[in-house]
Amino acid sequence: YSCGTCAPCQMGLTQFCKSKRSVGIDRDGAMTDYVVLPASYLHKVPDEIPDKLACIIEPFSMIYGNIVPVIRQTKAKNVVIIGAGQVGMFALVAAKSASVETVIMSGTTRDVDYRFPVAKKLGASDTIDSLTASLPDKIMELTNGAGADVVLDASGSEAGIHQGMQILRHGGTLIAMGMTRKESIPINWDACLKKAMHINFHMQSNYQYMDEAIQFFAHPYTDLSVLITKEAPLSQWKSLFDYMDTHDTLKNVLYID
């Protein structure tokens, strides 16, 4: 919920409202039969979108609304995504929706069996295990020595951020969307200046991003159901949560039974 009167709200940046209250964080969530919301915050979901996919539009909208404009503005022909989790997968989908020719996903050995195959189904050109291969060497090989037009860090790891800066081409853009959970991390400021790199920090969604994401989900470029690992009725919420604790998953859906 946003106040509609503060400076960010007046600029259309309702996600940065100084009085913002989020459902599931500051207000009760929606793992229940009924939830009370202001009508002005509701979006109509087209019939073409299955309920299970409608459930993941909100987190996807943050990635889609922030990444696609950068890709179009920079006319990126290749994008490297560091991190094969939910944010990374959403970034992959967003990049492919913007007609990026080459999208490369970097992850770790734990991603090889499940997440990398999902990434390939979603259109990833290549997947790289950064624990067994040199990410900088591999990216330079795949880009003929030019480096990446856009790097999106979805890992929040210090090593991932540093590698992202290293593989970026001169004048390229680093999009930061991974939380480091640290007060600060060191970066080579002079190296950033010499590369004339652009660094964009993005967080949160707004009503416009949601609408744009809904329009995309109604006519996606591929089957997005591969993003859903498991579904369960609300009455079996505990078993689903237990499953998530013991298995590698992406998005999981509870439905009203």
Sequence positions of predicted segments:
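NAD(P)H dinucleotide-binding glycine-rich loop of Rossmann-like/cofactor-binding domains
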Residues: 1-82, 111
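Short beta->alpha linker loops
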Residues: 1, 130-134, 155-156, 180, ...
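Structural detector of well-ordered beta-strand residues that form the stable sheet scaffold
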Residues: 80, 104, 173-175, 200, ...
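C-terminal hydrophobic helical "lid"/dimerization subdomain
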Residues: 90, 133-134, 162-166, 170, ...
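Residue-level signal for nonpolar/aromatic packing positions in well-ordered secondary structure
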Residues: 6, 45, 63, 95, ...
